[in-house]
Design a protein with these regions (language model features):
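C-terminal cell-surface anchoring/sorting signal
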Residues: 480-501
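Acidic Gly/Asp/Thr-rich repetitive segments characteristic of extracellular carbohydrate-active
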Residues: 17-52, 378-381, 385-386, 391
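Ser/Thr-rich, Pro/Gly/Ala-heavy low-complexity intrinsically disordered linkers and tails
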Residues: 1, 15, 408-482, 494
Length: 501
């Protein structure tokens, strides 16, 4: 009887281990031999990665596999390979270290992380990711039975993501590139200084697209440029839909003959600060039922609800420029304050184009003007909004001042051998003046906020251009002048949704 009881308890016994690593070889071995519940700890130092590190063992909800630095940002992974870390199994967490792309050719450093297929519930937390074309790439993979496996429920939280110079590549440049997958949350991050010096000259801070659902962007600080360099390229802040998806890569059909009519559904953008972009701060491309709530956009060309399947609501946003319905897009416009001059922001806040919205002047006109909408309970600083009527924008000024230089618990700059830095200006000519409205930043005009352009060799392919925004930001321009394989033995209940073939 005792023997039977012991055998019955065996599945509940944890085989998790604490594994400390000090070299790249030890790290590779620890990842390759990981067990559910393992905590892999990186000793301080530099780890040079010359081929992909693969994470193929499945963690569980109760026993995720954790990879973290012993000292926050004391460990730096230097990547000289196309993909530094590939995650194809669920329940992995990565915390407290830095990664830097060091490839001599920018097109050879695509991703710090590629999360694919059955890699649901992956967490990136308190990381500093520098100098990759797309620091995070998420995409579906063929399941082998005519369907596709998709990673769901990812979380990117309190990370700093940036480039030290424009990326000299024709490949997509999007700091967080999330294709397919439901219920992704991008929260409390600092995304800054991203630019593309090649191809279509279009870059994004982040987008979610390719048929995903219920994505959330909240309390992020996005600075398309933190320095004073001129922008002749096209930089877009946050997006549902990006530049669109070739139909063979879009849920639910994954069929070249079926258009990707909805790039994202039921997405939410709330309490974000987006500043200093040459194009729109928020771009919605075939994004059905999207909520844009209490964001502050300074020195951008506003918000676009674009194309016939884009619907939604915009409530309580504070911004330079306008919120537009374009090409049959529709939305309800409620208690937004638009057309605010950069000079008015500068009179109210310490350094708004640098993301510092510490109050230095009067903000009285913006306080108490919004009837609280559904879907929001706090502000950018994670403070509960309790007043009967709220301040417009990301900050609830009735609660007093709060620090906005970086998001709550977000990236801290410096440390780990990596320092924050400007993305620089894109050389090689202008492509038109920043004239607002339909004017053209390079690659723009009324042309393509594409986020795409060809395919990369990691299996995460991007479409050709879908003709997105590209309307340059007058406010930002004037401000410059004035100021893979997871072994599919069984499918647990939390595995990715499989689409029909």
């Amino acid at each position: 009887m005792k023997r039977l009881l012991l055998l019955a308890l065996l599945p509940a016994i944890s085989l998790a281990r604490d594994v400390r690593v000090t070299t790249e070889a030890e790290l590779r071995a620890a990842l390759g031999g990981a067990l559910p519940g393992d905590v892999i700890t990186l000793a301080s130092g530099t780890y040079v990665i010359t081929s992909k590190l693969s994470c193929t063992t499945a963690g569980t909800p109760g026993q995720p596999i954790v990879v973290r630095a012993e000292v926050p940002f004391g460990a730096t992974l230097e990547s000289n390979t196309l993909i530094a870390i590939g995650v194809s199994a669920p329940f992995w967490r990565f915390e407290d270290f830095a990664m830097r792309g060091v490839c001599p050719v920018d097109s050879d450093c695509e991703h710090a992380f590629q999360v694919t297929g059955l890699a649901t519930d992956v967490v990136l937390r308190r990381l500093r990711l520098v100098d990759f074309n797309a620091q995070l790439k998420v995409n579906a993979t063929p399941a082998g039975d005519g369907g596709y496996d998709m990673p769901h429920r990812g979380l990117v939280e309190a990370c700093e993501v940036f480039d030290t110079r424009p990326r000299a590549t024709a490949n997509p440049v999007t700091k967080l590139n999330i294709d397919t997958g439901d219920d992704f949350v991008v929260r409390d991050n600092f995304l800054h200084d991203f630019a593309k010096n090649g191809g279509n000259f279009i870059s994004y801070g982040s987008f979610m697209k390719s048929g995903g659902q219920r994505g959330v962007y909240e309390r992020n600080l996005v600075l398309c440029r933190s320095g004073g360099q001129a922008m002749t390229d096209t930089r877009i802040g946050l997006s549902f839909g990006g530049g669109g998806t070739a139909p063979q890569f879009c849920y639910p059909g994954f069929n070249a003959a079926v258009p990707c009519s909805v790039e994202h559904a039921d997405g939410v953008l709330r309490n974000n600060i987006v500043a200093n972009c040459s194009d729109v701060g928020v771009y919605l491309n075939r994004a059905r039922n999207t909520s844009v709530l209490h964001n502050t956009l300074v020195g951008t060309n506003g918000v676009d609800f674009r194309f016939g399947t884009t619907t939604g609501r915009a409530v309580g946003n504070l911004l330079t420029s306008a919120i537009r319905a374009r090409d049959l897009g529709t939305f309800t416009d409620t208690q937004n304050v638009t057309g605010v001059a950069v000079a008015a922001f500068a009179a109210a806040y310490a350094s708004p184009l640098a993301g510092d919205l510490s109050v230095t002047g009067s903000v009285t006109a913006w306080v108490g003007v919004v009837t609280p909408p559904s879907g929001v309970t706090d502000d950018y600083c994670a403070r509960t909004r309790a007043a009967a009527r709220w301040t417009v924008g990301a900050l609830e000024h009735s609660l007093g001042n709060c620090a906005t230089g970086k998001p709550p618990d977000g990236g801290t700059g410096g440390g780990g051998g990596l320092t924050g830095g400007g993305g620089g200006s894109v050389s090689g000519g202008g492509g038109g003046s920043a004239t607002g409205g339909g004017g053209s930043a390079r690659g723009g005009g009324s042309g393509s906020a594409a986020g795409g352009g060809g395919s990369v060799s990691d299996g995460g392919m991007e479409p050709g251009a879908v003709s997105g925004c590209g309307c340059a930001s007058l406010e930002s321009g004037l401000a410059v002048l004035a100021l893979a394989l997871f072994r599919r033995v069984s499918r647990p209940a939390w595995a990715g949704r499989k689409a029909p073939g």
